[in-house]
A protein has these predicted regions:
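Loop-to-helix element that buttresses phosphate recognition and phosphoryl-transfer chemistry
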Residues: 2-57, 61, 111-120
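Generic beta-sheet signal
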Residues: 3, 135-143
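Short, basic/glycine-rich phosphate-binding loops at helix/coil junctions
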Residues: 5, 10-16, 93-107
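Alpha-helix/helix-capping structural signal
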Residues: 10, 143-144
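Phosphate-coordination/substrate-recognition cap region in phosphate-metabolizing enzymes
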Residues: 33-97, 101-104
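Glycine-rich phosphate-binding loop signature in dinucleotide/nucleotide-binding domains
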Residues: 40-43, 127-136
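Acidic, low-complexity terminal tails and accessory targeting/binding regions
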Residues: 68-72, 78-90, 133-135, 151-195
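Internal catalytic-core helix/loop-beta-alpha segment
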Residues: 99-131
Length: 195
């Protein structure tokens, strides 16, 4: 069976609200609702989410369609960027480029990419240790740590080249549960048809 990593789609950006508390925007919610109607979502037997609002909202829409309960896991959160707080999109993109290009260093107090990769990978692998590989599972989280997890699963060095395209999130990559081999690269969530 398959595992899928789902990044939350577009969020309601509010510089006055801590980033982990941002919720989905209207567009993001619409994309998640469209995705929830797809057959692969109904086949999910387990959904595990980051504890950030936007991820939980996405996971809940998928879980409602699958008829399962969302499990929340703190260690699946996005890389810790609280040291800088909100950065306007152009500044954030430059910072993200630096984050991926310098994985052993911290960008102005951010969690280092190597540490975020170890955290997300350890969380996912711990969950999979006790998971029945015959049951499809979704991990719902964030683009940065999702990319770091994908690099770990493929054995590739940390690189923004492995990041989701298009901006705004709302993508999936899938991997086989039997051997954890990545089976498809980032695909818009509402376009992915399963494996």
């Amino acid at each position: 069976m398959f595992g899928v990593y789902v990044t939350h789609p577009q969020v309601q950006i509010d510089p006055d609200v801590p980033v982990p508390q941002w919720g989905l925007s209207t567009v993001g919610r619409e994309r998640a609702v469209i995705t929830a109607a797809l057959p692969w979502v109904r086949s999910l037997g387990r959904i595990v989410s980051s504890d950030e609002t936007k991820a939980i909202e996405t996971a809940q829409l998928l879980a409602d369609a699958a008829g399962v309960t969302v499990e929340v896991h703190h260690d699946m959160g996005e890389n810790d960027r609280s040291a800088t707080g909100f950065l306007p999109p152009p500044e954030f993109e430059k910072a993200a480029d630096w984050f991926f290009a310098n994985p052993t260093e911290s960008f102005k107090g951010w969690e280092r990419a190597i540490d975020a990769q170890a955290r997300i990978s350890d969380a996912v692998f711990r969950i999979l240790e006790d998971h029945d590989p015959k049951i499809p599972i979704a991990f719902v989280g964030h683009g940065g740590v999702g990319t770091l997890l994908k690099c770990r699963l493929t054995g590739a060095p940390i690189s923004r080249a492995a990041d989701q395209k298009g901006g705004g999130g709302g993508n999936v990559f899938a991997f086989r549960l039997a051997d954890r081999a990545v089976a498809c690269d980032w695909t818009p969530m509402e376009h992915w048809q399963g494996i």
